[in-house]
Amino acid sequence: MAEIRRYIPGDEDTLSVLLRRTLLEVNAHYCPQGEIEWLYNRYTPESVAQIAADGHTYVMTEGGAIVGTGTVIVTGELECEIIAAFLLPEAIGRGLGTQLFEVLEADEWCEDANRIWLTSSVNALDFYEKRGYVNPCGYRTRGADGLLTMEKRKKR
């Protein structure tokens, strides 16, 4: 079982490499090239550090090596978004995504939210659907922005 901790300054270089590598080696097979290029350019070490400063970023490690990450940000009253949730390609399919999402969804901001949402790549839709996320635009339908949005609403 992997360990999960909060981001510490200095993680940004490794996280940037992880995010970019997974985009190129996994997501590029399923997503439009323009989307991959935009995300690749977005996930510089500097922007990863800024994302961590603005949100609650979690880092998953195995044997001291970083193998995954995800961030929770507040996007509105009683609403949060999970962003930049990625695993290294060799870590996919081993249950680590489930472990990571258990921690992300237990984050205090998610606990307080009525709605948790995220944007998904095509290859991750099954994973999110199994976790109870639905697409508000319709089953596997891209929104007007071209993105696949998934959400989970809590009944209170």
Regions found by a protein language model. Name each.
Residues L87, G93-A106:
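Conserved acetyl-CoA-binding loop-helix of GNAT-fold acetyltransferases
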Residues V74-I83, I92, E111, R142-A144:
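A conserved beta-turn-beta hairpin within the catalytic core of GNAT-like acetyltransferases
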Residues V59, A65-I73, E81-F86:
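Conserved beta-strand in the GNAT
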Residues R115-T119, V134-M150:
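Conserved catalytic-core motifs of GNAT/GCN5-like acyltransferases
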Residues F101, E108-S121:
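Conserved GNAT acetyl-CoA-binding A-motif
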Residues R20-E46:
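Conserved GNAT-fold acetyl-CoA-binding loop/helix
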Residues A2-V17:
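A short beta-loop-alpha structural element at the N-terminal edge
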Residues Y43-V59, E81:
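A short helix-loop-beta-strand connector motif used in the catalytic cores of GNAT acetyltransferases and
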